[in-house]
Structures are given as structure tokens and as C-alpha cells.
Regions:
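Blade/loop signatures of beta-propeller domains
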Residues: 10-41, 194-197
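A short helix->beta-strand "capping" segment at the edge of beta-propeller domains
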Residues: 26-51, 96-107
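Beta-propeller domains
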Residues: 28, 60-97, 140-142
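Beta-strand-rich domains and repeat architectures in extracellular enzymes and scaffolds
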Residues: 40-73
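Surface loop/turn motifs at the tips and blade-to-blade linkers of beta-strand repeat domains
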Residues: 42-48, 87-90, 107-111, 149-156, ...
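Short loop/turn segments that connect beta-strands within beta-propeller blades
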Residues: 77-81, 140-144, 203-208, 246-251
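Asp-box/WD-like beta-propeller blade repeats and closely related beta-sheet repeat scaffolds
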Residues: 100-116, 122, 126, 130-191, ...
Length: 267
């Protein structure tokens, strides 16, 4: 009896080892791979078409749309038409922004704007823009001059509006202000001084109200993902972590950190 139990234990151990050996490869086989040979490189127009930041597609799958360093948001219309101007801030002046290609970009940004985050509300066709200097903006279907929706919150100006996302069910807009002390041209100071004055906010297009969901954030960067409708994720650019904030109860929002492998994240 004891000998039989010993053989059974050995067989069980061997089976467990075999499963452990093959499980990683089996799991890896279920992860779809990306064929990079099918990717397409789309050059931006010369001159002022530099510094692409976020990329977005509209509800019909058209695009991509991308903000560039002269303050415009461009739309890709295919190989035949190429890039066209889709939207721009109310203060945008062609002669001082697009045609002033020799002027350093940071010198133009306060006038021309610097669109960083982009996201469409697919139901309405509205494009929401997180402009580093202008604040949260919106433009309707078809583009044109954008409208500034939020440029200050609780009487505190937005100094470094960065990321934006839209809840496609409710239409609520989530956006970040990376620092209350420094603007985009001083982004290195945000990192070097370990600034933690960043904010995560929500704009309600039905009421035009703005709620502050989280304060004292360290350089919230990129788009605060609202796709799960439970947690908003934002990643500081210099830290190997993601910041998660509950989105369904903004007045009771709690922030938590999720350690990550820096090599697997892009912003």
C-alpha cells in the first residue's frame, strides 16, 4: 500500500511539473501577435507639422487625427488628400503659428496652443482636446475653431492640461492637469522638483460642471483611460507605476498605485 502511494505521489509530482513547463507556452500561444509588416508610416507635412502627440479616430473609424506643435489638430484623409487642418484654438493665427516655422515652438505655444490629448465622443461626433495652454476644448463634427470649455477649476488656472478621455456611455469627460506650478515648456521642472500638484478632473457636458476627482498627483501624463467605467488609469512619465482612481464615486475617489514593467508601457 505504501509503495503504491509513493508511486502515485511521484506520478502526481511529475504531472504537475509537466503542466508547469508547458503552461507558459500555452498561455503565450493565446496572445495574438502583431504583424509589424502591415503597419503604415504616415509622414506629417513638412515645416510646422512636427511633434505629434496623441492619436485618435472618430466614430466612423476615419483618421487618424493628431495634434502638432503649431497648435493645430490634423486629420489624415488617405493617400490622395493627405493631411488637412481639422481644428485649432480660438487664438490661432496662421501667420503667427503655421507660417512662423523658424520661431521656436515653445515661444508660440501660449498663443497658438499645444494640443496633447485627443478623444472623440462617438455618439455626438464631438472631439475633446486637452490643450497644454488653453485647457479643455471641444469642436463639433466637421472641425473648425474649437471652443474652450474649461481653463480654470476652483479659481485655479489649468497650467498644463495633458490627457483626456470620454466615457462613451455617459459622455462625461475626464482630463488631467499635470501641474499647478509649471506649464508644458517647464515640463522638466515637474519631474526634477518631484512636483505633486497634478489633478484629475471630470467635465459633465450636460451641466458644464467640473469635479476634481484627485489632487496631489505626481505628473499625471497621457490619457486617463475611462474604458472600464470603474477605474481611471494615469501614468507618471518618470515612474514605473500606474495610478488608478475610482471613477464611479468622484467624491470618494481613492488613488492606488499599480507597479508595472516600464518596458511594456508607452505614453
Amino acid at each position: 500500500m505504501g509503495c503504491a502511494m509513493s508511486r502515485l505521489a511521484k506520478m502526481t509530482t511529475a504531472l504537475v511539473i509537466i503542466v508547469m513547463l508547458f503552461l507558459p507556452s500555452a498561455m503565450a500561444a493565446t496572445v495574438p501577435s502583431i504583424d509589424h509588416t502591415k503597419s503604415q508610416r504616415i509622414p506629417l507635412p513638412g515645416g510646422s507639422g512636427r511633434g505629434p502627440e496623441s492619436v485618435a479616430f472618430d466614430g466612423q473609424g476615419q483618421g487618424p487625427y493628431s495634434g502638432v506643435s503649431d497648435g493645430r489638430v490634423l486629420k489624415w484623409n488617405g493617400d490622395e488628400l493627405g493631411w488637412t487642418t481639422y481644428t485649432y484654438s480660438p487664438d490661432y493665427k496662421t501667420d503667427k503659428c503655421t507660417l512662423a516655422a523658424l520661431t521656436p515652438g515653445t515661444n508660440r505655444e501660449t498663443l497658438c496652443g499645444r494640443p496633447l490629448g485627443l478623444q472623440f465622443h462617438h455618439k455626438t461626433g464631438d472631439l475633446y482636446i486637452a490643450d497644454a495652454y488653453k485647457g479643455l476644448m471641444r469642436v463639433g463634427p466637421g472641425g473648425g475653431e474649437a471652443t474652450v470649455l474649461v481653463d480654470q477649476v476652483n479659481d485655479i488656472p489649468l497650467r498644463f492640461t495633458n490627457g483626456v478621455d470620454v466615457d462613451q456611455i455617459t459622455g462625461q469627460v475626464y482630463f488631467t492637469d499635470s501641474s499647478m506650478n509649471y506649464d508644458r515648456s517647464q515640463h522638466e521642472l515637474v519631474t526634477n522638483t518631484h512636483d505633486t500638484t497634478g489633478r484629475l478632473m471630470m467635465y459633465d457636458p450636460q451641466t458644464a460642471d467640473v469635479s476634481v476627482l484627485q489632487t496631489n498627483m505626481a505628473y499625471p501624463n497621457g490619457s486617463p483611460s475611462a474604458t472600464t467605467r470603474h477605474t481611471l488609469w494615469s501614468r507618471p512619465p518618470d515612474r514605473a507605476s500606474c495610478s488608478g482612481t475610482g471613477s464611479e464615486a468622484p467624491r470618494q475617489a481613492q488613488q492606488s498605485l499599480l507597479p508595472t514593467n516600464r518596458a511594456t508601457l508607452t505614453t
